[in-house]
Each structure stands twice: as C-alpha cells, then as structure tokens.
Amino acid sequence: MKKIIVLLLPLILLMCVSGHAENDPEGLCALAARHGFRLGSCLSFNQMRDQKYLDILKAHFNSVTMTNEMKAYTLLDERASRGAADGMPVMNYAMADAMVGWARNNGLAVRGHTLVWDAYMCDWYFHEGYDPKQPYADQETVRKRTEYYIHEVITHFEEKFPGTVYCWDVVNEAVADSAGEYAPGDARHLRLKRSGADNLFQKYMGDDYVALAFLYARDTVEQLGADIDLYYNDYNAFFGDKAAAILALADSVNTFAPDGNGGFRKLMDGVGMQGYIGGYGTQQGCLEDGYPDMIRSAILGYHEKGLKVQITEMAVRNFEKEQARRHAEYYAELFRVFTALNTPEGNPLNCVAIWALTDDPTAPKGSYTYSLNSPYGGLLDEKLGVKDAFRLVENVLRGDE
C-alpha cells in the first residue's frame, strides 16, 4: 500500500499544480509566436509585490504594458519642474525604472504607454512656470515642453534599458466619439472635449498636436537609431465610424512632415486597438456574435492603409459568472480570428495584449474597474487559477481543436 501511495504521489502533485498557469510547460506567448504575434498583458506597480502574478507574466507573456507608471501624469514632477533652470519639465522615473528593469531581466519586451493623453493630464503642466495660479502658457512654450518631454522619456528608457521598449503609444484617445466633442466637418474627429472638459493639448498646442507629437517621437527614435515603432492608440477602434476617423487622423499625421524628396515622412507606424469588447458596466452587448468579424475587418482595413496593428488593452467583458463557458468559447473565437490573420503574404497583427487577465468578482458594482474590465472577463480566476477560457485559447494557439 505504501508503494502504491509513493508511486501515485508525483501524479497527484502534478494534478494539483496543473490548474495554475505559471506551471504550464509551454507558455501561451510561445504558441502565439507560431502565428506571428506577441502576447502581452499589463502590470501595475502594486503587482510588483505579487510573485505569483509575476510568475504568470514570465511564463505566458513576452510583452508587458505598465498600466499607469509610464504616463505623463505619473512621470512628471511638479516641484522639480517649477525649479528647473531651463524651464523644461522634470521627470521622476523611479517606479517605471523598477518595472521596466524587471521586464528586461525576465525577458519581456515593453509597450511604452503613453506619451500624450489628455485624460487625467496635469493641468499645471500647461501653466506659466508650471504654477496653476499663473496664466496658461503660450503655444510655443507648451510645444517646446512637449517636444522636450517626449524626447527625454523615449531617450531615458532606450539608453537605460536598450531595446526593451519596442514601441510607444505616442498619442492616446485623440479621436472623439460624440458630436460636440469635435469640430463639425473634421474627418479626424479630433477631440476638443472629454466629458465636458477641454483637451488641453489641443487647446494649447493647436490642432496639429497629434502630428507634432509623432514628429517629436520620430525625430527622437531616428536620433537614437532605435528600433521602436510608434503607435496611435484608441478604444472602439473596430467600429466603422471610429475606424474611419482614425484612418483620417493617421493620414494627416503621415502627410504632415515633408521628407525632402517630394514625399512625406512616415511618422505613425501603426494603430493600437484597445479591445474592450462588450457593454461598459452591463452584460448587454457582451459576447455578441458580430464583434469578432468586425475586429478582423478593422485590422485588415488598417493594414491595407500601411499600418501595423496591435490589440493593446483587451478585455473580453463578462458580468455574469453563469456565462463562463460562453465567455471561454467567445475568447477562443477571437483567437481563431487572430491566428488566421497572419499569413506568408502579410502580417497585419503583431501583438495581442490582454488587460483583463484575471477575474475580479469583488470589484464594487458600478466602479471603474468593474465597468471597464468586468468581474468575470479573465483568462484566470481571482486566485490566478486557469479557467476554461485559458484552456480554449491555448487549444486554438496549439491548433488542437
């Protein structure tokens, strides 16, 4: 009897760990690489203390996006900027450096996210002397600050962690959705307002702020001789009207800077489709049959215009625990779309980054996290155990269906 128990023990132990994603023998990212795209997820500074989560990132992903720590409102140092002798902004990279350093040391490439985003941006950045009690600065001053900021941030990470940051979301969410948020007749739907508040980049840099940001980024990348792609990133990018506006914006950016040979410099390499799929805060609109084909068509549409495509913040929303199997099948269908896109004739999709990696059933109903990612939208459960969604996606990537 003891001999039987001893023989069975390794099998029992294997069964016990098989439900944990960090113990899978072959990572999902290695399987995705067979189909020509990276597989990514996200990381917050607080998660740097969660070793199990870090182990899952190392096991299954080869790209990581910092949720907030590489954004301007995190990097900018108000007090130091006010004291800067040259009048240029000062950044504090402590948190971001720790995270990018971890990624480098563990073999993950980094999506830089994001250089210019009007939402949550520090108001003081736009004032004379960085002092909110002073008037807003003039256009030339704000443009110089932004050029300096973009140059310094890209340069910092490339020189400190060479080759680790492989792309940047240069501008985030500059295309508005609703009438009144953009000027009538503007095919780009360039955002003037967000929830009633002014887009301060547009207001104080001008209508060319997106193109200027890409120009500043392109100049920096070329000066560094770095292999870094430059992306425009937005939500709802697979809906027809939004996609048309994004394409109009991309065309305006890529016809902005003459190349000296009668053409234009290509400033924007690609489009990041955020990939929040389903209703915001509600099951209505979730797991709808038509979305996978819409996503496929949008990716091909961007690719046909010479733009690379990444899915940058994917959350396959599900607010009902009872829909777990349907959610898993839906996730698998999305990955069937992704794996079929890249062929020897073309490679339109180069990364899929999953934002809602884990379930979060304790998120308060109506909260931002609950509404954005949904409580049951993960590949993993709240204890980081694998769900049917994980296994079905794995099967698609393996070709084991």
Predicted segment positions?
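Boundary/entry segment of secreted carbohydrate-active catalytic domains
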Residues: 22-63, 67-69
